[in-house]
From Swiss-Prot:
SUPFAM superfamilies: YhbC-like, C-terminal domain, YhbC-like, N-terminal domain. The gene is rimP. It comes from the Bacteria. This is Ribosome maturation factor RimP. NCBIfam families: PRK14638.1 (NF011231).
Amino acid sequence: MFEEMIVEKVRKEAERIAEKQGLEIFDIQYRRESRGWVLRVVIDNPVGYVSVRDCELFSRELERFLDREDLIEHSYTLEVSSPGLDRPLRGPKDYQRFTGKLAKIITKDGKTFIGRIESFVDGIVTISDEKGKHEIDIEDVRKANLEIEF
């Protein structure tokens, strides 16, 4: 409960900062780990990729807010990062945004598809691999993420 309260208060300010910097909040977590409490904020750039500089500027501004508001009584580590090159795909906007990119989709019945996202229309993602095109209803997706290309 305490952790959820912290996350919600941080989320409001984080969203304000992100919007000002042309970014979005991908995820926020606050939890105890083996090394202590960690406040993890994952930022995203809706029109490209997140740079180290984006993380640095966002982190500085969020730190100022956290110091000023003194929301967290004990010591903690603030981590600001991007979703990564193998980022999860979490909904229609992601499938549309990453059309043409290599992705891995695991369905609820255990099938795995690795291929290029061809399209996303009416809740159906079309992915093509060496065997052809596959249409997958996103309601049937258990897990999906981009694959790193070399």
